[in-house]
Amino acid sequence: MGETIKCTFNLFEEGRQYTGHHRNYILESAIKACYAPETREGIRLREKLGYLGHGRREIARKLQLAEVEPVKLPDGSTIIVENIPSNITTFFEVNKDGIVEHHQEILETGPGKVVSGLNASKVGGFSWACGGQDGGAMGATRIVDFHGFDYVMNPGFAKN
């Protein structure tokens, strides 16, 4: 097994003033998604995978990725993209005060090695991949499901 990175952040304290998404999370929805039976089972079975960046999920237009995904290019052609994870969520909790704690086991894969190096250099951090309704800076953001934590260059929560 690879190294484990333990993170804690507060849903109501982004640690950013000028950058970030400034979302107003509905706490109850985050707690419900965290403790949903499918989330707990996915963590237990080591299926809540994370990737280097959100890009793979974005180009596939879905949060739950297969090992390979067909991706349609602007010219109409299709390519096959391999989705090699960098990390696995092994622990995930959200408490009534909005404190989120999660542990990420870094995988012995190419992307995992990049994540390990970036983290050791204090560049980037983890960002959760959740389905739901994004209210942006002015509305309420509701989480309905959890798919893992990706490693991104500018995480929404600076302490993550």
Predicted regions and their residues:
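Signature of dsDNA virion morphogenesis modules
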Residues: 1-160
